[in-house]
Amino acid sequence: MTINALLLSSSRVGDTPYLAHAIPFIKPLTTNAQKWIFIPYAGVSMSYDTYLASVVTGLSELELDISGIHQHPDPQQAIKDADGILIGGGNTFHLLHQLYRYDLVTLIGEQVALGKPYIGWSAGSNVSGLSIRTTNDMPIIEPPSFNALNLVPFQLNPHYSNYQAPGHNGETRAQRLLEFTKVDPLTPVVGIVEGSALWRQGDKLSLLGDQPAYLFCGEQQEIPIPVGSDLSHLLKA
């Protein structure tokens, strides 16, 4: 079996309905997967039931059977029984903390390596990389480790934008990712813009959507990755 993982930058683009832009990206992963488990642990400011309902509504046209992991007495068994795994956005630190709390980090990696499709957006994409050291989120809780699912052997930065508001004197996103590459110059970081996604199919990695991505690695800073690029070489990192 081969890894089949879709890593979305965001759940929305502009004012579009929740997950609407992602339907064409998600649909191919559902061909042989009807029963999905949704992991809402990144959702801190809403109830897990509310979060689940928004996902079910957003993906309703795909007619999937989606349940929340919080509805199952045994989270590990719920992962094993599902045909596919969905992880939504929110706070990446809280998400990873809970994945460690229920001992799901290694299990999810193993299940995806066996061919179980994985779909994540925002925080759900952050945790798919080597670690969460390039998340945008506030560290509201401390997970046992920053090491993540390792579905791709590099770092991700969803919602990537280097916009700086006039008069604002804080660091830009590019400056913050530069700091990471100074500390860890050998590990690539891919910034994915809202509306785009990375899709790993075994040894193939593709950039989906109509926006470029951006690569940071060592002395290479904010290198544009053209729309439709084959990024398979990053899987050999």
Swiss-Prot record:
According to the UniProt record, what class of enzyme is this?
A: hydrolase
Location in the cell: Cytoplasm
**Alphabetized Gene3D superfamilies for the sequence:** 3.40.50.880
Give the EC number(s) under which this enzyme is classified. Answer: 3.4.13.21
Instruction: Write out the catalysed reaction.
Output: Dipeptidase E catalyzes the hydrolysis of dipeptides Asp-|-Xaa. It does not act on peptides with N-terminal Glu, Asn or Gln, nor does it cleave isoaspartyl peptides
Active-site residues annotated for this sequence: S122, D137, H159
CDD domains according to UniProt: GAT1_Peptidase_E
One Pfam match: Peptidase_S51
* SUPFAM superfamilies associated with the record: Class I glutamine amidotransferase-like
What keywords sit in the KW lines? Cytoplasm, Dipeptidase, Hydrolase, Protease, Serine protease
A GO BP annotation: proteolysis
- Molecular function (Gene Ontology), one example: dipeptidase activity
In the UniProt record, does the keyword Acetylation occur? no
Q: Which residues form the signal peptide?
A: none
Q: Name one GO cellular component term.
A: cytoplasm
User: Record's family?
Assistant: Belongs to the peptidase S51 family.
Role, per record: Hydrolyzes dipeptides containing N-terminal aspartate residues. May play a role in allowing the cell to use peptide aspartate to spare carbon otherwise required for the synthesis of the aspartate family of amino acids.
Q: Which HAMAP family match?
A: Peptidase_E
Q: Which NCBIfam families match?
A: PRK05282.1
Q: Could you identify this protein by its name?
A: Peptidase E
Q: Which organism is this entry from?
A: Shewanella baltica (strain OS155 / ATCC BAA-1091)
| Gene name in the database record | pepE
